[in-house]
């Protein structure tokens, strides 16, 4: 009888220890950041801008700096390097919204699109322009590729004064200094200097 009681007591103690070890292990694991899905956004201009602002907020939240050698996804960049530029920002926005698959990116050079994937899968319309910005009819949500500067950003609309508004994940979204640190890639701003530059092409998401 005593031996049976002792055996049961040892079994209970072993179970309790194992349970405590599991609890400690669970508590020690940091919760993963919640990743938004494309389905979390309304498939319209408002949802597209919201997705872009979410990416911009993450650049500030995770202390990104401006530069090259960035990763093909935002999550990979958060883990390694934390570098961004205008093209990676727009690419990550398109991934966030579901236009591009995770890991698909593009960049611009010489007024041309250089994509690191085979196809846009019919999700966008590429409009060749080659005109000064002031002569171009833009729609809110358009992605702009510039002819005479190596840059790409997102047109949001106009303010009450008729000034064009932008979301920009290039150096314009960073603080000046030896290290260009992001702080405003989620902020809608006017960039009047763009008025003198030429638009090479527009990437227009279908259905917006």
What are the language-model segments listed below?
Residues 1-38:
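Gram-positive cell-envelope targeting signals
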Residues 39-44, 124-133, 148-208:
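Aromatic- and glycine-rich peptidoglycan recognition patches
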